[in-house]
């Protein structure tokens, strides 16, 4: 058995090496970007949800640069961010241009910190992205808080900071955070009230044979509040019919869009996949911005896509397609392949109905040009 396993591992390593050398030849030494590395990630038992998101984030350059800068800071106690920084640094400093890396330390830490991921079952890539970004932000805010406290103690200032004060935004917020404004207009007095809400990613409903632009417009459709759903107007001091709509007030540097492809079906008593064909362009501009939005004409370029392959949330596989310099790559755990830009169309989804086995875009990462 031991010999068989060793032979199997050796065969696997040989295959990885063959894939790596083929990719290097396909790109060519003259075209290969300086200081760039393309490394697949070993799957530790249904960890493709994690691998695909990590590859997408690695090729979101502002995020990668901040994580690598964090690595260069004085050594800190191990946490999820230090493990991520070690992984990114390991990829970025490899002598080889292409290859495979086992993200074992990161996966071990992830499973230790959150029981949701402490198993060998398929997890949701969007849940993982959400958890990762929020955890990193929490770590950075806690470290900043500790630094302030240590600074005050050194200066002899023992007064505690107001615990209710809003924490300063971190570089996670600077990169991914946008702001939505919820506008409600009373149909009696025409008074408009608005409430702001921050987001790190936007979850949008999907419809058959549409585009991401259409889905985003639907996200901002006007909703009429009437009957038992009437809105309490402060001006009228009574419940009134009203129009409500959501607009984008602040556009993020990197816009992460989550396509809501998993829907609970009452008759089936389970979630099923909406394999609808949703076109996502290489260039994107948002049209549902508020009147007071900063830089409302901001243009975005698609830099990465997390793709779900399969027919349901608990069955299937995740891969990532990323843009690096002027070409596109597909990361399927330890396999890395160069693909044509036209091949992205294969990941839009299917024109047929639900519950189909499909490879469809699930999380889109758009980076601002400015």
From Swiss-Prot:
CDD domains tied to this protein: Peptidase_C19G
Gene Ontology MF terms in the entry: cysteine-type deubiquitinase activity; cysteine-type endopeptidase activity; deubiquitinase activity; metal ion binding
Phenotypic consequence of gene deletion: USP12-deficiency attenuates CD4(+) T-cell activation. In addition, USP12 mutant mice show significantly reduced tumor growth when compared to WT mice. Both the frequency and number of CD4(+) or CD8(+) T-cells isolated from the tumor are significantly higher in the USP12-deletion mutant mice.
Disulfide bond entries: none
Signal sequence extent: none
UniProt keyword list: Cell membrane, Cytoplasm, Hydrolase, Membrane, Metal-binding, Nucleus, Protease, Thiol protease, Ubl conjugation pathway, Zinc
Gene3D superfamilies: Cysteine proteinases
Location relative to the cell: Nucleus; Cytoplasm; Cell membrane
Catalytic activity: Thiol-dependent hydrolysis of ester, thioester, amide, peptide and isopeptide bonds formed by the C-terminal Gly of ubiquitin (a 76-residue protein attached to proteins as an intracellular targeting signal)
Superkingdom of the source species: Eukaryota
Enzyme class: hydrolase
Residues covered by the USP domain: 39-369
Biased composition (Basic and acidic residues): 146-157
Xref: PANTHER family: UBIQUITIN CARBOXYL-TERMINAL HYDROLASE, UBIQUITIN CARBOXYL-TERMINAL HYDROLASE 12
Family, per entry: Belongs to the peptidase C19 family. USP12/USP46 subfamily.
Function: Deubiquitinating enzyme that plays various roles in the regulation of the immune response and inflammation. During TCR engagement and activation, translocates into the cytoplasm and deubiquitinates its substrates LAT and TRAT1 and prevents their lysosome-dependent degradation to stabilize the TCR signaling complex at the plasma membrane. Plays an essential role in the selective LPS-induced macrophage response through the activation of NF-kappa-B pathway. In addition, promotes that antiviral immune response through targeting DNA sensor IFI16 to inhibit its proteasome-dependent degradation.
Protein name: Ubiquitin carboxyl-terminal hydrolase 12
Species, as recorded: Mus musculus
């Amino acid at each position: 058995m031991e010999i068989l396993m060793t032979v199997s591992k050796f065969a696997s390593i040989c295959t990885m090496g063959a894939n790596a050398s083929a990719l290097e030849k396909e790109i060519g030494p003259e075209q290969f970007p300086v200081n760039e590395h393309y490394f697949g990630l070993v799957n530790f038992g249904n960890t493709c949800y994690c691998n695909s998101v990590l590859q997408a984030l690695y090729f979101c350059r502002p995020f990668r640069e901040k994580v690598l800068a964090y690595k260069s800071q004085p050594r800190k106690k191990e946490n999820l961010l230090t493990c991520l920084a070690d992984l990114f640094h390991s990829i970025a400093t490899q002598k080889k241009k292409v290859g495979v890396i086992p993200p074992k330390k990161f996966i071990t830490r992830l499973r230790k910190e959150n029981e949701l991921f402490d198993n060998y079952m398929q997890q949701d890539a969007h849940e993982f992205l959400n958890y990762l970004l929020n955890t990193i932000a929490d770590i950075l805010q806690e470290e900043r808080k500790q630094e302030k406290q240590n600074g005050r103690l050194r200066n002899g200032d023992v007064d505690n900071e107001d615990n209710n004060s809003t924490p300063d935004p971190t570089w996670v917020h600077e990169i991914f955070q946008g702001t939505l404004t919820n506008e409600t207009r009373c149909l009696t007095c025409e008074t408009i009230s608005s409430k702001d809400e921050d987001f790190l990613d936007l979850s949008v409903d999907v419809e058959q044979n549409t585009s991401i632009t259409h889905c985003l417009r639907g996200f901002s459709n006007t909703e009429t509040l009437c009957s038992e759903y009437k809105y309490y107007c402060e001006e009228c001091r009574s419940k009134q019919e009203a129009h409500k709509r959501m607009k984008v007030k602040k556009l993020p540097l990197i816009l992460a869009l989550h396509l809501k492809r998993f829907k609970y079906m009452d008759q089936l008593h389970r979630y099923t996949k909406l394999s609808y064909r949703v076109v996502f362009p290489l260039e994107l501009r948002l049209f549902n911005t508020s009147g007071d939005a900063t830089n409302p004409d901001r243009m975005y370029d698609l830099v990465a896509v997390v793709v779900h392959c399969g027919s349901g949330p608990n069955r299937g596989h995740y891969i990532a397609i990323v843009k690096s310099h002027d070409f596109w790559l597909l990361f399927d755990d330890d396999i890395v392949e160069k693909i044509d830009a036209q091949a992205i169309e294969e990941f839009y989804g299917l024109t047929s109905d639900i519950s189909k086995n499909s490879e469809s875009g699930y999380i889109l990462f758009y980076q601002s040009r400015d």
